[in-house]
Amino acid sequence: MTCPRQEREELEKILVGDFGVRAADSYGRRRAEEEDPVRTCFQRDADRITHSKAFRRLKHKTQVFLQPEGDHYRTRLTHTLEVTRLARTVGRALRLNEDLCEAIALGHDLGHTPFGHAGERALNEIYGPGFRHYEQSLRVVDCIEKDGRGLNLCQETRIGILAHTKGHPEESREAVVVRLCDHVAYLNHDLDDAMRAGIVAEFELPEIIVKRLGTRNSRRINSLVDNIIRTSSAGNVGISDDMQEVWDVFHEFLYDRVYHNPVAKGEEAKVENILRGIWEHYCRYPEKLPDDFRGIMERDGLERAVTDYVSGMTDDYAIYQYGEIFIPMAWSVK
């Protein structure tokens, strides 16, 4: 008698094309485990990431704007969920493995710092070997979660997480889908948030973006997703040459007007002061590190453990920690 997992694996032989990764053909995990009777290996990966502490913390990590006032600005968690939905849609249309797309998408930003890319740039300056969030995402799932044991994800999921920014020679087509959908998501929702914040007005959008993608967020997303699906074939996942021009203009516009706008850049010095202060404090007083990071310190060294701890903080917790360390406690005098 077959179990639900085996039935799903048989179904994948029909649903997942020759260029996709079928769960039954996975390279497996770093530590061998007994198969689950209900879920495929990639479904288990997605569940493990969703139930991790690092995933829950994404809800309090900045996407673009530091400490925004309002309930509708994106966070690193909402961004991750948007990427996940887009990746499943594209993966299904291209007859790739939706579950692997989902697992990679859910884990792709687990290593992001507090305060978004401003925090990443700060830690890259502070930590000698340098800091890259995609490498940290892999580190989170490999050796930080579960008290240092990691989530023991499948090799395809691990490579996809590492490859989501720069690519990897062993990456799957599912990993390429997630990388493209990551761009589709942040291009559109960062513009939407910038317009909501009054940083950019609709009339300022480059003409090529309006003509090819429209003015509504949903239409822009649909146009880009449709182009990926229509362009990708025979194992090659990408966008058309003419859409690449729009893509490049879109990126350049956001970098000039949103990511590097004077207000955002003006806050970066504060971010570096906060993270540098916390980082140097724990390097000076390693005995104050949480117990979870003592084992990492013994295994990988003090500075690595402190970097892991600081990079995992949420925006609010980093500000709280800075206050606890450097701001004198208020005393009530009667």
Question: What kind of feature is each model-predicted range?
Answer:
Residues 102-107, 180-181:
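Short alpha-helix carrying the canonical HExxH Zn2+-binding catalytic motif
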Residues 106-107, 124-125, 295:
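Conserved short loop/turn motifs at secondary-structure junctions
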Residues 111-115, 185:
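Short active-site segment of divalent metal-dependent hydrolases/proteases
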Residues 1-80, 85-90, 97-98, 119, ...:
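Histidine-centered, transition-metal-coordinating active-site segments
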Residues 116-127:
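A glycine- and small-aliphatic-rich helix-loop capping segment at beta-alpha/alpha-beta transitions
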